[in-house]
A protein has these predicted regions:
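Divalent-cation
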Residues: 1-83
Length: 83
C-alpha cells in the first residue's frame, strides 16, 4: 500500500491520525480511487512518502475519516466529490 503513495494525486489527512492516498487519471478512471490508508504511525509514513515525492497533502479531517473506512483499491463514492 505504501508503495502506491508516490503515484497518488493527493493525500487527505486528519491532520495527524489518519491519512488516505487517492489516485485519479481523468479519462482513464471514472472516479478517484483509494490506493493507501493508514492511522497513527502508518499515517505518518504515508505523509512522509507524499512529502518526499511531491504529492499534495490536504487537511480535511471529516473526509479523511470517511475515506479511511473504505477498502483499498476502491472508487470514491460521488458524495465525497467536490467541484
Amino acid at each position: 500500500m505504501l508503495a502506491e503513495v508516490p503515484k497518488a494525486a493527493v493525500v487527505i489527512t486528519n491532520p495527524t491520525h489518519y491519512a488516505v492516498a487517492l489516485t485519479y487519471r481523468q479519462g482513464d478512471t471514472s472516479a478517484p480511487r483509494l490506493v493507501a490508508k493508514g492511522v497513527d504511525s502508518m499515517a505518518a509514513r504515508i505523509r512522509a512518502a507524499a512529502e518526499a515525492h511531491g504529492v499534495p497533502i490536504v487537511s480535511a479531517p471529516p473526509l479523511a475519516r470517511a475515506l479511511w473506512r473504505m477498502e483499498p483499491d476502491t472508487e470514491i463514492p460521488s458524495e465525497h466529490w467536490q467541484a
